[in-house]
Regions:
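N-terminal mitochondrial targeting presequences
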Residues: 1-6, 29-51
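Short Gly/aromatic-enriched secondary-structure transition segments
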Residues: 132-140
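N-terminal, polar/Ser/Thr-rich
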Residues: 177-179
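Sterically constrained small-residue positions within well-ordered secondary structures
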Residues: 26-28, 110, 135
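N-terminal chloroplast transit peptides
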Residues: 1-27
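Divalent-metal-activated hydrolytic enzyme cores
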Residues: 41-116, 122-124, 139-141, 147-175, ...
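Short N-terminal binding/cap micro-motifs at the start of the first secondary-structure element
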Residues: 127-129
């Protein structure tokens, strides 16, 4: 059952509205690469997080194989993408997303030379590939991360990042705020499951949102006491804040009888994070002195579902909102519909 989002109040707009709104073959074929199944995940290098890409990258990487092999490879990656889109429609590969983000922001004057990025992702280390991609575009970002992508940096944190921005000769500054929760959806399509480098067996993401899941059933039954706004557990501050924000975002009557599944919780988190980020930006940014953008979505980790078969670890993003304000003029961008995708060759070269 879909969750009603009617209780989530949409933040007022910034500026004036301008809506631009497999298994490896037993014997290798000539010209192909044989990949052996990994039996013991704990033997994987911990820094392998830097090697993840989206599906289009992997499609092109086998350009030296036979046509039949190439077709099988493309079919495999298309199936992986279809699995992700069953849960998060409109999702695209991480490389694809980064390419489009850089191009679209460049159209509005945001570049690595004149802009500072602020990243609000989950503290989980598997969010690193996406963050590294943003660093490649804008240089090192101001880190305002929090559990599940719920920042606790507040106005002081955002203000610190803005004070580090490059400045034009006329004194104008530019900021891009990235904010999103994350979720694992393994290669078989099971939400929440992933395999981590250096750790044998199955792991999960996002752990904070998985911990939160049962609370919605408690809320539905009337047995959940929501923490008062502005208060937190001093021994568990970030989780207690995200729990209060999430549970306050829905009415008990809107929660399905069986509670919320992890995909629903993640989508709700995206909505709540959007609202909170817009509130922070509105309270801290002066559009007369700077240009800025807010980019939200869901980061999705598509890793293998078994250690007995080889399945490449891939990263996806479901874009949900992109708001750009330049000289006080607001533009809402549909990233997928309005920004051309890179060619496979471009992705591979990048």
């Amino acid at each position: 059952m879909a969750l009603s989002m009617a209780s989530i109040k949409v933040a007022p707009a910034f500026g004036k509205s301008n809506l631009a709104t497999r298994k490896s073959s037993p014997a290798p074929r000539r010209g192909s690469v044989t990949v052996k199944a990994l039996k013991q995940n704990a033997s994987v290098k911990h820094d392998s997080y830097n090697e993840h890409h989206g599906p289009e990258y992997f499609k092109y990487s086998g350009v030296d194989t036979t046509p039949d092999e190439r077709q099988r490879r493309h079919t495999y990656y298309d199936k992986r993408t279809a699995i992700i889109n069953q849960h998060f429609p409109g999702s695209i590969g991480m490389d694809d997303w980064l390419f489009r983000i850089e191009n679209k922001l460049g159209e509005f004057g945001f570049t690595g030379d004149n802009t500072i990025a602020q990243t609000n992702f989950c503290r989980d280390e598997i969010t690193a590939p996406l963050k590294n991609g943003i660093h490649d575009i804008f240089g090192y970002a101001m880190d305002i991360d929090g559990l599940a992508g719920f920042t606790a940096a507040g106005l002081t944190g955002l203000g610190a990042g803005m004070s580090h921005s490059p400045t034009d000769p006329n004194g104008r500054e530019r900021y891009v705020f990235f904010a999103m929760p994350h979720i694992a959806v393994d290669s078989a399509g099971k939400p929440g499951d992933c395999i981590r480098a250096g750790r044998a067996g199955c792991s999960h993401a996002c752990g904070a949102l998985i911990k939160l899941q049962p609370k919605f059933q408690e809320l539905k039954s009337g047995g959940m006491q929501i923490r008062a706004p502005g208060t937190c557990d001093h021994m568990d501050p970030e989780y207690s804040l995200l729990e209060a924000r999430m549970l306050s975002a829905v009415q008990p009557a809107d929660v399905p009888q069986g509670g919320l599944d992890l995909v629903q919780v993640t989508k709700l988190a995206d909505s709540v994070i959007q609202k909170h980020m817009e509130e922070l930006v509105r309270a801290s940014v002066d559009p007369s002195k700077c240009d800025f953008a807010i980019v939200t979505g869901v980061q999705i980790h598509s890793y293998g579902h078994t250690l007995d078969e080889w399945h490449p670890n891939m990263e996806y993003v479901q874009p949900t909102r992109m708001t750009i304000v330049v000289n006080g003029q607001r533009t809402d961008v549909n990233l997928v519909e309005e920004t051309p995708a890179p060619t496979p060759r471009q992705l591979w070269k990048l």
